[in-house]
Amino acid sequence: MFTLYKSLKFNLFVKSAFKVILNEPLLNPLTKEIFIVNNKETEQWIKIFIAKKYKVCTNIKFFKLKHFILNILKQNTPKLYSKSEFSKYSIMWKIINIPDIQHLLTKIVSKNNTYSTLFKIASSISNLFQLYLKYRPDYIKKWEQKSNIPKTRLKQKWQQIIWMRIIKYTKDANKPILHFSNLLYDSIKKMQRNNFINTKLPVRIFIFNITPITPQYAIFLKSISKYCSVHFFYATASYNDKQMFSTSFIKFKQTQEISNNQLLSLLHSKNKNIIYHEIENFQKNTKFQSYWITYEYEQMLFLSLIKDKTINLNFKIKQNSLLQYLQNKILNLHSIQKKNNEQENNKILILKTDKSLSIHSCHTLIREIEVLHNNLLNILNDNNDILFQDVLVISKNLDTYIPYINQIFNSASSKNFIPFSINYKNIKNIEFYKTILELIDLPNIELNINKITNLLNIPTLLKKVQINEQEIPILLQIINQTEIQWENDNILSNDWLSNDITKCWEHGLQRIFLGQIINNIDYKFWENIVPYNEFSTLYYNIFNKLISLISLLNKWKKILSKPKFLSHWDITFKKLLNDFFTDHEQKQPEAKLIIKKWTEIIHSGMQEKYTKKISITLLKNELCNSVSYISQSNYLFSGKITFCNNFTLTNIPFKIIYLIGLNDNISSNTHESFDIYNLLKLHPRAYDPCDEINHKNLLLKTLLSAKKFFYISHQIVSNNYKKLNNIPIAIDKIIKYITQYFYIKNKNKDNFNDNLKDIKSHIYHNYTFYAHEKRNFLEKLNYPNFNTTIWKMATLINNSHKEFIKKLPSIKNQTINYNTLILFWKNPIQTFFHVRLNIQLNTTKNKHMHQNKHFINKLDQYKMNKTLLKFFLYKQNTNQLFQYYKNIGIIPNNNIGNIIWEYTKKLITPLYDQIMKIKKILNNSKFCINVKNKCMLHGQLKNINSSGGLLRWKATKLSFQDIISCWLEHLLYCSLYKKHNSILIGTNHQIITFYKLENKTAKYYLKKYISGYFDGMEQPILLTKSGINWINAIYDKKNNKFYTNTNKNLNAYKIFLNTWNGNNWITGEKDDPYIQKMIVYLTKKNIQKIYKTTKKWLTPILKNISYSKYH
């Protein structure tokens, strides 16, 4: 007998199952009861519930439905192989192995018919066939009977050809044509003829809410119900047949006895039969439910046709809150069309203190988690009967939230700490998986600085060569200092530019080993090897570990680079695992799953006798497509709140259910590239899989499963918290449904739009972009913030005698080193953070200095310019310097290196000539003067030209930092000595002259910049590159005044914005982390402030300098 139980309460299902077990005990008490569930989470919940309710949970065997059916089929099909001939990978390898199919696929992808592409197509076609075997067995049957599927000839012709080739290939190999679809069909036929072996069937089976269930599975269960009792528990939001189904449909199923074939014909037919009419009527006659439970309704229709008996497990919901009233309305199908006055008269008042259902709108993921944490603390503090394990948090895409969950929940104070467990692991984030992929991908990578640095982040590799965490920074320093790029000399043999070995590992090792014996002095080298002797004994030992790691990786790179037979890959993969992982690591659940998938891929190909050699890259790609995530059901109900990915715990009751990330893209948007050939898409039927419709149904069931509180959060796009926009459709439906049956203010009760505003203001909460924004403290919040820092800030606001923003204490007058003053004015904002606040922000990107094989980077170029100029000035041998840079690897050891060196000499020679023209005898002078209110300025002025003035040069283009540095030195010179011009020279024939100043004027300016230093150490001075470029464009250097022309002003503004925003080649100033702390959004007010600051500090410089060119 097939007994259908309908309810929404999962605990009622388990109670009903045990009522049967207790009232009808099995003859053999040792026989196990069979429970069929969807997932491990449901299995664990049932075990815990039984153990709590009946004190013991034993003698129960849990199955997934497909595995249960497969076990029964094996008992009745002696020829059924343990490994299916029509599994996903078996079909894929058959497609790859059959020459006719390869030729056909080559025509389909004529634009790109590489072997890699054909491999991907075979995998996609295999996925399609798996769908057909499950949801379109009639198509498979027609193909095998050599008949066409109506209206799909062009789309299905080549698929039919491939399928028939697979069937022929299988027959030729003397293997039975036993795919799952055929096995189900044949077994159902046998049961109809009473030829089915039922001796090993269980006496009864209990099936708990298997959704979605395909018609073929349902008919099979109906068929075996002749031999054993089938108890099917179906969780549904509406279980009253008289409300769900039309009178004609109820009469039809009561008067008609429908065979299995008739059932299938009703499903397969596209004519408007009773099922399709019923679905259409349901969608027409409902408003709310038709949006949410269409998929469930289709399932209910079919189950109602095959069941022998229906038991409705009724229950009552206490109606004490908005959530409970809403649940009751939905369960009683209160959206069936009624007269407006009937709805209005039955509206229910929502109390202002009712927080049982609320919706929270946030701008960012981290803000969502902050709001989640605060709301949970608020509820838990107010409800002592709610334990941590009574809380369930669901997300459709938990991966994106996990970093923020760990950050927010783990950083809470001990008083506000909430223990949590995440019932989900994305396999692709598992360390074992990432390490395996890195190792398998060795043939496709070059072991340069970037890659080696990345590999040092993999704990498994570090453990292999005994590198600890403290040694990693040292290794990174070693890698950058030694400038080693490539792993061996063989790579260079195919280099068309030339044979540069200065940065390969072997040459690098020679430098380091030589450095242990010979010192690197005065740019000397030995046999074209420059010794590297900056290693201490500790560094040298650590570097030896790195050598061991690189040697091991090179060994495996060589092994994995060559294509191999599948049997060889099977052995090689086992050796790879044993070489890098311990037995314990290989036995972890995640590792076992990955190893199992790899083995399945390899062994399926070996079973199909694939005899060609194959690269490991193709196997790696298939492995990446095969693994997804693993659930961690052992962490469920362990005294912590549970974070759950997707709706795996739907229908399991929790006191608090919180749904995060409920945006319009809640359903999966991933589309297979072969969707255009998918016959399910071309001719959809009832009961076809549809993520979007199914997720709507699961969302509604989740709402109905919450006992006390149901919260939703989503993201909005707008940064304006006052503007409510982008409300997801699902949330909008819930709000409007509540408006239809509930009200806040009696005066707006009968006006839908006014009532809608009242409802929104009560249940819909729109949060600010940041937790610390002023609005959070000035307004009375329904959901207080428990973050310790935020509370301290709020306390400051609430106390009127304290200021919310405090100024830093003033710096007392003190002795200042002149170099400190210059350092400040080179970058006032950064110096404020470094010196005043002691804050260092990371401004470097994840790039390495020496990653290019043949070209020199800017820093090395500057160092080389500076050293070459020094050699010129001291009349030293520049050829030796050239050879040194080639041997050390700064300059490529090829023709490009010669070109770079000639370019450098051409750049520096004019600079040297100009210096020698101006330079006389250069002197240095120490000073210590009182400049302002007992503030002593001390230091040393260098390179004072005997002919008068300062002489400064820079072996690169002159920048603002060079100009302001020389300007401050010039002010000091004019304050101390006679009036003379000072000169600053740069490359590209640049020369800047600083005009001589009166002693009084120079002191005035110097005091002004010293005062600016003190002010800037209390409140940052907005002296930015954008402002500097703006003032250079707006200042008329010839006439020493600012342009007033509108076009000039507009052009200067464009230059300002270009510098601020940057482009594809130059990073914008807005990306500077220090400036980001000062200017979050660039407003007109900020721009004017930058203009004003730039004018104040740079105008004196522009008025007292001149630009010229030297020859």
Curated annotation (Swiss-Prot):
**Which CDD domains does the entry link to?**
RecC_C-like
Q: Which residues cross the membrane?
A: none
Q: Name one Pfam family in it.
A: Exonuc_V_gamma
What the entry lists under Gene3D superfamilies is as follows: 1.10.10.160, 1.10.10.990, 3.40.50.10930, P-loop containing nucleotide triphosphate hydrolases
Gene Ontology terms, MF aspect:
ATP binding; DNA binding; DNA helicase activity; exodeoxyribonuclease V activity
Protein name in the entry: RecBCD enzyme subunit RecC
Q: Which Gene Ontology cellular component terms are annotated?
A: exodeoxyribonuclease V complex
Keywords from the UniProt entry: ATP-binding, DNA damage, DNA repair, DNA-binding, Exonuclease, Helicase, Hydrolase, Nuclease, Nucleotide-binding
Q: What else is known?
A: In the RecBCD complex, RecB has a slow 3'-5' helicase, an exonuclease activity and loads RecA onto ssDNA, RecD has a fast 5'-3' helicase activity, while RecC stimulates the ATPase and processivity of the RecB helicase and contributes to recognition of the Chi site.
The record describes the protein's role as:
A helicase/nuclease that prepares dsDNA breaks (DSB) for recombinational DNA repair. Binds to DSBs and unwinds DNA via a highly rapid and processive ATP-dependent bidirectional helicase activity. Unwinds dsDNA until it encounters a Chi (crossover hotspot instigator) sequence from the 3' direction. Cuts ssDNA a few nucleotides 3' to the Chi site. The properties and activities of the enzyme are changed at Chi. The Chi-altered holoenzyme produces a long 3'-ssDNA overhang and facilitates RecA-binding to the ssDNA for homologous DNA recombination and repair.
The entry assigns this protein to a family as follows:
Belongs to the RecC family.
Lineage of the species this protein comes from: Bacteria, Pseudomonadati, Pseudomonadota, Gammaproteobacteria, Enterobacterales
One Gene Ontology term of the biological-process aspect is: double-strand break repair via homologous recombination
Q: Does the keyword Hydrolase apply?
A: yes
Provide the assembly information: Heterotrimer of RecB, RecC and RecD. All subunits contribute to DNA-binding.
- Keyword Signal listed? The answer is no
